Curated annotation (Swiss-Prot):
Provenance organism: Exiguobacterium sp. (strain ATCC BAA-1283 / AT1b)
Residues annotated as signal peptide: none
Gene3D superfamilies: Imidazole glycerol phosphate dehydratase, domain 1
Subcellular location: Cytoplasm
Name the UniProt record assigns to this protein: Imidazoleglycerol-phosphate dehydratase
Known pathway: Amino-acid biosynthesis; L-histidine biosynthesis; L-histidine from 5-phospho-alpha-D-ribose 1-diphosphate: step 6/9
Enzyme class: lyase
InterPro entries: IGPD_sf, ImidazoleglycerolP_deHydtase, ImidazoleglycerP_deHydtase_CS, Ribosomal_Su5_D2-typ_SF
Single Gene Ontology MF annotation: imidazoleglycerol-phosphate dehydratase activity
HAMAP family xref list: HisB
Similarity comment text for this entry: Belongs to the imidazoleglycerol-phosphate dehydratase family.
Length: 195
């Protein structure tokens, strides 16, 4: 099984996180940021990975450190759980409708971290979650997971639906990218993938 866990402690956050890429979508999420908990639960469900996250963060400041540090930790666990990347599809994509919104995620498990994020989120805040933190989370996952990640809200008007669509699309695309391609080879003509 492709699993990994991490305990990460800084002066801003204390994180205990476990990931199973070959799970069933089971999750237990406690970040102290309600909307973010909801998004991570959706991510686990739609990627079919098991994700357990417990965070003690400086949320009295704001949610930035918590959200970014969870992204860093999740990215590191993706790298660790994938190991040598032999036999994975490498690429994944998903379109996700959410009522009036259409979101898209495209992933390359390339070893070359890059994020393109195109989402005009209208509300600056959803509950205790600053909507700009969605981009910070995905950047942290992409950089630390060594993923090329393109995310876009193609259209929509409801900020909750837009961010939810991105998390769900990312989950589906990630599930495809890390799934087996039925071979025992590295998915690169170079014979090498960084990270």
């Amino acid at each position: 099984m492709r699993t990994a866990e991490l305990k990460r402690e800084t002066k801003e956050t204390k994180i205990d996180i476990q990931l199973n890429l070959d799970g069933t979508g089971e999750s237990s999420i406690q970040t102290g940021v309600g909307f973010f908990d909801h998004m991570l639960t959706l991510l686990a469900f739609h990627s079919q990975m098991d994700l357990h996250v417990k965070v003690e963060g400086d949320t009295w400041v704001d949610a930035h450190h918590t959200v970014e540090d969870v992204g860093i930790a999740l990215g590191q666990l993706i790298v660790k759980s994938l190991g040598d990347k032999v036999g994975i599809r490498r690429y994944g994509s998903s379109y996700m409708p959410m009522d009036e919104t259409l979101a898209r995620a495209v992933i390359d498990v390339s070893g070359r971290p890059f994020l393109v994020y195109q989402a005009d989120i209208r509300n600056p805040k959803l509950g205790d979650f600053d909507t700009e933190l969605a981009e910070e989370f995905f950047r942290a996952v992409a950089m630390n997971g060594r993923l090329t990640l393109h995310l876009a809200v193609l259209y929509g008007s409801n900020s909750h639906h837009m961010i939810e669509g991105l998390f769900k699309a990312f989950g589906r695309a990630l599930a495809e990218a890390v799934s087996s391609d039925g071979t025992n080879r590295l998915p690169s003509t170079k014979g090498w993938i960084e990270g």
